């Protein structure tokens, strides 16, 4: 009897679990009036739309998102034929949510042709949302009647570029925090926020602006403390937003207590970068691993080609390296790499950037990502080198294309000593020039 009762309860429980699971993974079914978006149709349905589009960025596990579902479907039915009401699973399609700086759920954005997306911050009832949409539609109609927009694309032209610009702030979680932050040698500034926090929402555009302006110089990241309770507890975060600075001592981050504006955050970050920066480095290019480490992530890599050790001796080479260290120290706050290589040690690199023969010392500014370089055209002196770095930072001017892929070979590092001159006794002129007598005899025999 007990076995029969047990069997009879298995099916309904399984069905219930399946229903709950299915509901959690798809808030909007195929019969829903809400348009379901994915990365593959986002551009055609939203960005290329000629009308107003309301987009909900949701996560299936989010309780507030589940509560909003019937309201959002009512909005879709109300605005049918007037505006498009859509939704995208931002948890499954993180690339799209990151592009638009979505950090909490649900987030509602209104896309109007010719303008950047608008964050909806009003009440989450059907009437309020619909009224907000109608307001945007009226404004769009007025602009079109006044000839201010062509209405060909949703956010076209320069505004589309601005709208789609992703945030440089890195989304951090329990799976990547240690690898990216605590185990890194780089300076990190991290915002700990909660999606429901009003101050966090106010900070969001300033944080994005600061992150984008500091890209390539200082790493900025953010942690959703509602989703990452373990990280929140680990760093004793008690209020939102909390901004911590992870400098040289990653185990003891320092709180940021300055103004919550992009300019203030940027100024503070650059000050921290200077105080946390280690000594300048100019590394010998002894193989592809050095190239990747020093130049792979650098905005610009400055490669110096120094004379053969037999020509400059150790004293001369050290003077060149002192000059390069002086230049590297001047720009150590910038995302540049500085490497050097002895004449003839990297023949393929020399060939591709037009260095070689008797043109040592030489320097080129290398942008491997763009496949371009610019050569130093003035004298190899500290002042000229510093001016060259400044000019290269402006980009474009004097750049030349690099044909093909550079082959960097593995070489032995310089031992810091003078080069050894090969004794004349170790070879004969006959070995180099051939034996004239033998050549003469062979000629006579041929005759």
Swiss-Prot record:
A motif (Prevents secretion from ER) lies at residues 444-447. The record marks 124 as: Lowers pKa of C-terminal Cys of first active site. Residues 27-139, 161-275 form the Thioredoxin domain. GO terms for biological process: response to endoplasmic reticulum stress. It comes from the Eukaryota. The record marks 260 as: Lowers pKa of C-terminal Cys of second active site. Its EC number is 5.3.4.1. The keyword Lyase does not apply. Induction: By chemically-induced ER stress response. Disulfide bonds join 62-65, 197-200. Glycans are attached at residue 173. Keywords: Disulfide bond, Endoplasmic reticulum, Glycoprotein, Isomerase, Redox-active center, Repeat, Signal. The active site is at 62 (nucleophile), 65 (nucleophile), 197 (nucleophile), 200 (nucleophile). It catalyses: Catalyzes the rearrangement of -S-S- bonds in proteins. Residues 1-26 form the signal peptide. The record marks 63-64, 198-199 as: Contributes to redox potential value. GO terms for molecular function: protein disulfide isomerase activity. Residues 146-170 are annotated as: Disordered. The keyword Isomerase applies. GO terms for cellular component: cytosol; endoplasmic reticulum; endoplasmic reticulum lumen; nucleolus; nucleus; plant-type cell wall. Widely expressed. It is found in: Endoplasmic reticulum lumen. Acts as a protein-folding catalyst that interacts with nascent polypeptides to catalyze the formation, isomerization, and reduction or oxidation of disulfide bonds. Belongs to the protein disulfide isomerase family. This is Protein disulfide-isomerase like 2-2. It comes from Arabidopsis thaliana.
């Amino acid at each position: 009897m007990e076995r029969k009762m047990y069997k009879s309860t298995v099916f309904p429980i399984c069905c219930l679990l399946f229903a709950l699971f299915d509901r959690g993974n798809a808030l909007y079914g195929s019969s829903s009036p809400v348009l379901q978006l994915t990365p593959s149709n986002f551009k055609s349905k939203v960005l290329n739309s000629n009308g107003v589009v309301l987009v909900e960025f949701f996560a299936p596990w989010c309780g507030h998102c589940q509560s909003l579902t019937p309201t959002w479907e009512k909005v879709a039915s109300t605005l049918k034929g007037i505006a498009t009401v859509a939704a995208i699973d931002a948890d499954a399609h993180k690339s799209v949510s990151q592009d638009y700086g979505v950090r909490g759920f649900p987030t509602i954005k209104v896309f109007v042709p010719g303008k950047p997306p608008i964050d909806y911050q009003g009440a989450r009832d059907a009437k309020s949302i619909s009224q907000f949409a109608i307001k945007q539609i009226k404004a769009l109609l007025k602009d079109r009647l006044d000839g201010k927009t062509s209405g060909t694309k949703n956010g076209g032209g320069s505004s589309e570029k601005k709208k789609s610009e992703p945030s440089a702030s890195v989304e951090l979680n329990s799976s990547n925090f240690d690898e990216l932050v605590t185990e890194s040698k780089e300076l990190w500034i991290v915002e700990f926020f909660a999606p429901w926090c009003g101050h966090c929402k106010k900070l969001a555009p300033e944080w994005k602006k600061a992150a984008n302006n500091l890209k390539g110089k200082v790493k900025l990241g953010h942690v959703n403390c509602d989703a990452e309770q373990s990280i929140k507890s680990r760093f004793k975060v008690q209020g939102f937003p909390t901004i911590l600075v992870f400098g040289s001592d990653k185990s003891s981050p320092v709180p940021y207590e300055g103004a919550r504006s992009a300019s203030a955050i940027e100024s503070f970050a650059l000050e921290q970068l200077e105080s946390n920066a280690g000594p300048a480095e100019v590394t010998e290019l002894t193989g592809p691993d050095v190239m990747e480490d020093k130049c792979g992530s650098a905005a610009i890599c400055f490669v110096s080609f120094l004379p053969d050790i037999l020509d400059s001796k150790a004293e001369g080479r050290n003077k060149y390296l002192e000059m390069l260290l002086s230049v590297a120290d001047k720009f150590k706050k910038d995302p540049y790499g500085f490497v050097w290589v002895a004449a003839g040690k990297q023949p393929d690199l020399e060939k591709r950037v037009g260095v070689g023969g008797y043109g040592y010392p030489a320097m080129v500014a290398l942008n491997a990502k763009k496949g371009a370089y610019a050569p130093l055209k003035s004298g190899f002196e500290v002042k000229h080198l510093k001016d060259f770095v400044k000019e290269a930072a402006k980009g474009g001017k004097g750049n030349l294309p690099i044909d093909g892929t550079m082959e960097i070979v593995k070489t032995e590092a310089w031992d810091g000593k003078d080069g050894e001159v090969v004794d004349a006794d170790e070879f004969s002129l006959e070995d180099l020039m051939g034996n004239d007598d033998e050549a003469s005899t062979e000629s006579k025999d041929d005759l």
